[in-house]
Amino acid sequence: LELGVERLILGSAAVKNPELVKEACAKYPGHIAVGIDAKNGDVAIEGWGEGSGVAATELAKKMADYGVATIIFTDISRDGMLSGVNSEATAALARACGVPIIASGGVASLDDIRNVKKYEKDGVAGCIIGKAIYTGAVNLPDALKIAAAKEE
């Protein structure tokens, strides 16, 4: 971070070594994000290979208490499936912890981006688009226009 990196994202460390996250937040306030990958509300770790037995909501609240700037929430069941973003679960997580959440997993169309945008007031700060861009299902300039649009 001393070299100018804007944000550091920690993943499994949030479950396996939460003190590391706490220390990083104290040393670099506003620059630490946590990735929470979950299926049916249970946080997965080690590249989704293991369940943790930790509820996503509880982990998000703990990370908020530590001072993380952002949480990237991946609904594992939707990632790469082009099946739509789990906007409701993402918004519920944002409301529960009070930290801006970036949705990850499931974007299939511009309508998904519009849907995520509806939850800005709940604390959903944006979404990650992967496969939908590679397949051409989402045009990046159009997606950026939707993301930049002011709420009506």
PLM-predicted stretches and their roles:
Residues A13-A14, I36-A38, G84, V99-D111, ...:
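Glycine-rich beta-to-alpha transition loops that act as phosphate-gripper elements at the mouths
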